């Protein structure tokens, strides 16, 4: 009998929490933002978590998702820039590398290496995103070491 009452109380408490999350618009938005963050749609997650914080400034889930989305977007942008720079370097190297092109390549390498150092690492960030950013940096370090 006591066991049944304990189970009923536990289910009731879980239902209350679920009702709270479902009825509070700020937490509803925060849950959607968390879903988009986990789906690697960082811009949508950022927008939704910002809306959730606008509704309730004390929503910790939304604040965490907002901060993590900002960091993830910086990592994604770094990776995207790295790919674009590598494409430009490949195009430059197909026609022969002039002294000016050599300086541009060196500058691109320096920018990518320095930008990596400015990225804010977090334990909550996706490991795949962090490792891809690190490998992008390593490509530019290797390229710089081999060429200069």
Model-derived features: positions:
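Alpha-helical tetratricopeptide repeat
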Residues: 23-37
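Hydrophobic membrane-insertion alpha-helices, especially the h-region
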Residues: 4-22
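Canonical positions in the second alpha-helix
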Residues: 51-52
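Alpha-helical linker/edge segments of TPR/alpha-solenoid repeat scaffolds
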Residues: 68-95, 140-148
């Amino acid at each position: 009998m006591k066991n049944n009452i304990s189970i009923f109380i536990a289910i009731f408490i879980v239902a209350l929490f679920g009702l709270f999350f479902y009825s509070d618009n700020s937490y509803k938005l925060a849950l959607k933002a968390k879903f988009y963050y986990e789906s690697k749609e960082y811009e949508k997650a950022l927008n939704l978590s910002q809306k959730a914080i606008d509704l309730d400034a004390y929503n910790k889930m939304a604040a965490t998702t907002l901060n993590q989305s900002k960091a993830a977007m910086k990592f994604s942008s770094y990776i995207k820039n790295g790919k674009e720079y590598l494409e430009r370097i490949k195009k430059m190297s197909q026609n022969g590398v002039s002294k000016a092109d050599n300086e541009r390549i060196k500058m691109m390498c320096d920018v990518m290496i320095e930008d990596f150092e400015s990225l804010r690492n977090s334990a909550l960030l996706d490991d795949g995103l962090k490792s891809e950013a690190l490998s992008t940096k390593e490509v530019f370090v290797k390229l710089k070491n081999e060429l200069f």
